[in-house]
C-alpha cells in the first residue's frame, strides 16, 4: 500500500483524537463545579470520554484502509494488494480495536470506580491533621474497586466457558461460518464486549432519544436576554395584580382583616406570601439585567442577535438530521426482522443489506476521503451531544430515584464520574448502533466493488475494463465467487457481527433495544407538550384571579435559575 496514503489516513485520525480531547475537556470544565475540582477526577473523565469516542471514530479509518485495496472503478484488487498485505492491514486494525475495547472496559470497570472511591475517601480534616496518608487512601479506594474487578473476572470466565456457537439444523450459516470463534480467549473477550454493549444500548435507548428530541428546541428557543425581559414584564404584571387584589380585600374590611370571612383571610395570606416571592424574583431579575449591561455581555448579546437566523437554520437542520437517522435506523431494524435468514438463532444477522439513505450518502462520500470522515464525525457528535443533553435533562437515576443532577458549573466530582460512566457506556451502545444499524453497508464494505465476471485463469483476477456493467458493489453474501476473493469486510463490522453471531441472545437484545430507542423520541416529545400545556393552564388560572395554595407559576429554565439563586441566597 502506498505509504503517503497510509500517512494521510492516520494523520486524519490523530487530528480527530486531538479534537476529541478538546471536546471532552470543554464538557468536563463546563459542567464540573469550580469549588470542588479534582485534577485526578478531571483526568479520568476526559481520558475516558476521549478513549470511547476514539473507538467509534476509528471506523472511517478502518473502511478507508480496507477499501484502498480495491479499485472501485474496475472491481478488482490493486497490484500491491496481495492477500498477505490485506491480512497485515486487517491484523493491525484488529489489534488496535481489541486494545481500545480493552482500555474502554478497563476505564468503565476499574478506572472510574477507583477515581470515585479515591475522591470519596478524602477527608480534609484528617489530611490536614496528618491522620490520612496517600497510601491509606489508595488502599481504601482499591478495596472497594476490587468488587468491580471481580465482576469483570466473572464475566470473562462466563465467556470463556460458554458453549461455542455451531450450525443448527435448518439454519445453514454459509458465509457467516467464518465468523464463528474457535479461540476460547477471543470468545471470552467477545462475551465481555457484548455484555457491556448491551448495558450501553439500554442506557442509549433511555437517555439519547430525549436528548435528540431537545436539540432542535435548544437552537430555536429565545435568547436569555429576551427571556429575562419577558420574565421581568410578567413578574411586574403579576405583582401589580397581586397588590390590586390585596387592596380589594382590604377595602372590604376597612383595613381590619378580622372582619373578613375565613376564605378571604386565607386568600389574603396567600397573596401576601406570593407578594414576597414576586418581590424577591423581581430583585433577582434586576440584578441579572444589571449584569447584562456590562460590555462583554452586551457584545455577546448583540452577536447572538445577529446570529439568530443561523441558529434557527441550525435548529431546522438538526431536526432534519434527526429525522433522517430515525428513518434509517427504522429501515435497518425492519430489514433485520424480516430478511434475517435465521432470525434470533444467529442474532438477526443479514445476508444482504437493503438500501439505506444515510449509508448510501456515506458510501458515495467515501470515494473522496476524508469527506466521509467529516460527515461521520458530525453524526457522532450529534448523537453524543444528544446523549449529554439527555443525561443533563433526566439526571443520574436508579429506577425512578434521581441520585445526581447534572448542571453547568454545579456538578460535584462524584456526579461527574457517574455521568462519565453513563456516557462511556452510551458510547459503546452508540458504536454498535452506528456500525450495525445506521450505516451497515458503509461500515461493512464501504465503496468496495467486485467484477462479476469469470476470470480466464485461476491465478488472474476478473477484468471488467470492457464490461463496466458487471462491476457490482460488495455485499455480505454474494452469489459470485469473485466477491469472496476481492471484497474485504471492515474489522469493526467483523468484531460486532461476531458478538451477535456467537451469542444470539445479545444480537436479539440489541435489536429490541433499538426498537425502544425508536419509540423513545416520540414518547419524550409527547410528555414535553403535556408539561407545557399543564403550566399554561396554571398560569391562566392565576391571571384570572383564582389563587390556589399549591399553585406554581409557569416555569422556564430561567425562572428555575432565579429560584435556585434565591434559595442559595436564602441559605447564606
UniProtKB/Swiss-Prot annotation:
Entry similarity comment: Belongs to the LIMR family. LMBRD1 subfamily.
A GO cellular-component term linked to this record: vacuolar membrane
Organism: Aspergillus fumigatus (strain ATCC MYA-4609 / CBS 101355 / FGSC A1100 / Af293)
UniProt-annotated location(s): Lysosome membrane
Alphabetically ordered keywords of this record: Cobalamin, Cobalt, Lysosome, Membrane, Transmembrane, Transmembrane helix, Transport
GO-annotated molecular function: cobalamin binding
Descriptive protein name: Probable lysosomal cobalamin transporter
Region (Disordered): 522-544
Single Gene Ontology BP annotation: protein localization to vacuole
Domain of life (superkingdom): Eukaryota
UniProt main location, coarse: membrane
Functional note: Probable lysosomal cobalamin transporter. Required to export cobalamin from lysosomes allowing its conversion to cofactors.
Membrane topology category: Multi-pass membrane protein
Transmembrane region(s): 8-28, 40-60, 95-115, 145-165, 188-208, 314-334, 374-394, 421-441, 499-519
